[in-house]
């Protein structure tokens, strides 16, 4: 039987090819690091439950997207139905950092009229001696776009949990404040299953009818 969860958040992980998107997701969802990882073709799907507060769990649907240009038309279709995302670059590959702006602009075009909460992720921080992007300039770019910045390593399991849980908590706070709402026809946020809780007026009416019988 599936564990109980309060909400389901659909997340998307984007960035250039070879920045380590699949490795990061597999470390988070499966607890393992693959030394050799085949390039993602189109989109792959993963899921995991995260407990953000005692007794409050969020189900994450995580979409791993291909970074190659020839798959962009496929991955763009998933932007609109995502509420959050990790935007990855490789700290040893300056070009992948320079392309962050392009990824963000592309996302803005395809998510309308909704919004995506992003965290900027500098991946492969275990290769610090090969760094081509300083933490300072990455933090500056993230601040310019209103994003958090975090550095991770799938190989050494550094900040992998933190990247996903911080993003989940940020989305959860926006949902609690009513700044992000569940909307018909949008898959970004869905209400979960909580026992002994009436979720709609229709359910109340059904309950009252049963009592009158």
From Swiss-Prot:
It catalyses: GTP + H2O = GDP + phosphate + H(+). Mg(2+) binds at residues 22, 40, 64. Switch I, switch II and the interswitch regions are characteristic of Rab GTPases and mediate the interactions with Rab downstream effectors. The switch regions undergo conformational changes upon nucleotide binding which drive interaction with specific sets of effector proteins, with most effectors only binding to GTP-bound Rab. A lipid is attached at residues 211, 213 (S-geranylgeranyl cysteine). InterPro entries: P-loop_NTPase, Rab39, Rab_GTPases_membrane_traffic, Small_GTP-bd, Small_GTPase. It comes from Homo sapiens (Human). The gene is RAB39B. This is Ras-related protein Rab-39B. Its main location: membrane.
């Amino acid at each position: 039987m599936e564990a109980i969860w309060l909400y389901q958040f659909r997340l998307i992980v984007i960035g250039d090819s070879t920045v380590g998107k699949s490795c990061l997701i597999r470390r988070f969802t499966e607890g393992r690091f693959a030394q050799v990882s085949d390039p993602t073709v189109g989109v792959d799907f993963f899921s995991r439950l995260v407990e953000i507060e005692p007794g409050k769990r969020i189900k994450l649907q995580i979409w791993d997207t291909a970074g190659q240009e020839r798959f962009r038309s496929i991955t763009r279709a998933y932007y609109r139905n995502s509420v959050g995302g990790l935007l990855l670059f490789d700290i040893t590959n300056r070009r992948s950092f320079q392309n962050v702006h392009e990824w963000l602009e592309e996302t803005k075009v395809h998510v309308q009229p909704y919004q995506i909460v992003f965290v900027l992720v500098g991946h492969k921080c275990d290769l610090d001696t090969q760094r081509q992007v300083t933490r300072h300039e990455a933090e500056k770019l993230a601040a310019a776009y209103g994003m958090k910045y975090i550095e991770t390593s799938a190989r050494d399991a550094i900040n992998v949990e933190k990247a996903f849980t911080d993003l989940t908590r940020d989305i959860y706070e926006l949902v609690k404040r009513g700044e992000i709402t569940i909307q018909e026809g949008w898959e970004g946020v869905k209400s979960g299953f909580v026992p002994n809780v009436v979720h709609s007026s229709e359910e109340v009416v059904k309950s009252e009818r049963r009592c009158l019988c």
